[in-house]
Amino acid sequence: MADLEEQLSDEEKVRIAAKFIIHAPPGEFNEVFNDVRLLLNNDNLLREGAAHAFAQYNLDQFTPVKIEGYEDQVLITEHGDVGNGKFLDPKNRICFKFDHLRKEATDPRPYEAENAIESWRTSVETALRAYVKEHYPNGVCTVYGKKIDGQQTIIACIESHQFQAKNFWNGRWRSEWKFTITPSTTQVVGILKIQVHYYEDGNVQLVSHKDIQDSLTVSNEVQTAKEFIKIVEAAENEYQTAISENYQTMSDTTFKALRRQLPVTRTKIDWNKILSYKIGKEMQNA
């Protein structure tokens, strides 16, 4: 073990540490970070070499953050990254600094929005917030309006989590939806992600995702937003139902097949007659 440690360069150690951090289960970033910190035993090397991993984790996980002085949380995503460690809150038209290690937002400042698409963005956001409030008690959503390859594009992100460390499980839902504002019809592209970690009597993770494509009729802002939410709701309901049904199937068939219902003798022990069995006599004599 000592020989292996001597063979690893600082660069290799940081690369391994960064992988652990990026793949930390939802709600367990601090635990993984502290374990990696002990293993590496070099805080400066960890902070400097693995800083990109802290950022990547928050971007991948759609980490929600509360900005002081503002009511609603905003998601940390690649779509809101405006550079230099700053992120966009499109609803409040501000940008802010974000500390990826402490997960804190500071220094909020006004930020000019894409005026040409803002009315579309606002309509979608209003409809999406109502949907999230109804379906995700702990949900947070952020809607962006951007010009991508010359096309006005709406990007909607949803995050909802339950962290139950006392009960040995944590889980997070993420979904991302995109469509361009084009006459008549457009294509909606979505990706749905679920990640759950259970670790009381073992170490089990569910990591699942599903890609979605559908067509959307584009009319005015409000009506288009309503039709968009119908697509989101149908797809997310179907996905969650399928996950639940698969788990029920595994519980009824797959997991039961992993163990015998009866011992090798194909006979259940009658505990009331245990003393008449040879093992009972041996236990009594012991």
From Swiss-Prot:
UniProt KW Endoplasmic reticulum keyword: no
UniProt superkingdom: Eukaryota
Gene Ontology annotations of biological process type: actin cytoskeleton organization; barbed-end actin filament capping
GO MF terms held by the record: actin filament binding
A cellular component annotation (GO) from this entry: cortical cytoskeleton
Keywords assigned: Acetylation, Actin capping, Actin-binding, Phosphoprotein
Functional note: F-actin-capping proteins bind in a Ca(2+)-independent manner to the fast growing ends of actin filaments (barbed end) thereby blocking the exchange of subunits at these ends. Unlike other capping proteins (such as gelsolin and severin), these proteins do not sever actin filaments.
Modified positions (Phosphoserine) in chain numbering: S9
Pfam family, one: F-actin_cap_A
Family (UniProt): Belongs to the F-actin-capping protein alpha subunit family.
Alphabetized InterPro entries for the sequence: CapZ_alpha, CapZ_alpha/beta, CapZ_alpha/beta_2, CapZ_alpha_1, F-actin_cap_asu_CS
Assembly, per entry: Component of the F-actin capping complex, composed of a heterodimer of an alpha and a beta subunit. Component of the WASH complex, composed of F-actin-capping protein subunit alpha (CAPZA1, CAPZA2 or CAPZA3), F-actin-capping protein subunit beta (CAPZB), WASHC1, WASHC2, WASHC3, WASHC4 and WASHC5. Interacts with RCSD1/CAPZIP. Directly interacts with CRACD; this interaction decreases binding to actin.
Name of the protein in question: F-actin-capping protein subunit alpha-2
Aminoacyl-tRNA synthetase among keywords: no
Gene3D superfamilies documented for this protein: F-actin capping protein, alpha subunit (3.30.1140.60), F-actin capping protein, beta subunit (3.90.1150.210)
Organism classification: Eukaryota, Metazoa, Chordata, Craniata, Vertebrata
Residue pairs linked by disulfide bridges in the UniProt entry: none
Positions carrying N-acetylalanine: A2
PANTHER family: F-ACTIN-CAPPING PROTEIN SUBUNIT ALPHA (PTHR10653), F-ACTIN-CAPPING PROTEIN SUBUNIT ALPHA-2 (PTHR10653:SF2)
Species in which this protein is naturally found: Artibeus jamaicensis (Jamaican fruit-eating bat)
